[in-house]
Regions:
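Generic short beta-strand segments
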Residues: 75-82, 157-159, 179-183
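A general secondary-structure signal for short beta-strands and their flanking turns/coil
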Residues: 68-70, 93-95, 171-175, 191
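Charged, low-complexity helical/coil segments in non-catalytic cytosolic or luminal regions
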Residues: 90-172
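A short, surface-exposed beta-strand/turn
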Residues: 86-112, 186-206
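Accessory, solvent-exposed terminal regions and/or long lumenal/extracellular loops of proteins
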Residues: 169-173, 183-187
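Conserved histidines in hydrophobic membrane contexts and catalytic metal-binding motifs
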Residues: 14, 100, 176-182, 203
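Intrinsically disordered or highly flexible coil/loop and linker segments, enriched in small
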Residues: 23-24, 142-145, 187
């Protein structure tokens, strides 16, 4: 926690503002604690790195104080309590489309990307998590590898598809998101998180 306010209280204040704006977000929140002395050290490192690589040196802040302390929150939008996933995903793409910077004076920055007003078109019946596990087992069964796969979480989400930039519209499809921890058989201490998506009606890999 930062001196000006506990992290939980800061997020509570942010949530209240988002509610007033009609922005529904997940409770799965990432928070970076931006403490002024740490930011000062990181700035010095960035300048030293730029000098070493002979690249453009970033402009240094005159002085870092407690007034610069802030929380940087990241999360994603939901609709009818289900996460809405962006159309482009994977390595290099961030699923968190809502970000907020909050300091002792309140919200300093709030952004939401890739948002589409949503309306109910039709209801669908989704397959059970048990069927998803079977599909996941088959999926990894087709991979020739000695790696170890551990299912961390399976959650029902909605994925943006068929984006029409001209009409500023898109459709969403229900998907099961499977978070799997992959442990490298050759490097026991090396592991990474893999996300696999199945269409929640057809179990087709997306």
């Amino acid at each position: 926690d930062l001196p000006f306010m506990p992290q939980k209280e800061a997020w509570k204040n942010v949530s209240e503002v988002l509610d007033k704006l009609g922005v529904d977000v997940s409770d799965d929140v990432i928070c970076y604690v931006m403490e002024h002395s740490i930011m000062s050290e990181e700035e010095k490192k960035a300048i030293a790195r730029a000098e070493e690589e002979d690249t453009k040196i970033p402009t240094a802040k005159t002085q870092w104080t407690e007034d610069d302390d802030c929380y940087y929150f990241m999360t994603y939008t939901t609709w009818q309590d289900y996460p809405v996933l962006p159309p482009v995903m994977g390595e290099g793409f961030d699923e968190n489309n809502v970000s907020v910077i909050y300091n002792k004076n309140g919200i300093q920055s709030l952004s939401r990307n890739g948002y589409y007003p949503l309306e109910l078109k039709n209801e669908v019946e989704v397959v059970s998590p048990e069927m998803v596990l079977k599909a996941l087992e088959k999926y990894f069964g087709n991979i020739i590898s000695d790696d170890i796969y551990e299912v961390q979480r399976i959650s029902l989400c909605q994925k943006v598809v068929q984006v029409n930039p001209d009409k500023h519209s898109a459709e969403i499809e229900p998907v099961w998101e499977c978070r799997v921890l992959v442990k490298n058989s050759d490097l026991p201490d090396s592991s990474y998180l893999q996300k696999i998506y199945f269409h929640a009606e057809t179990l087709k890999v997306m």
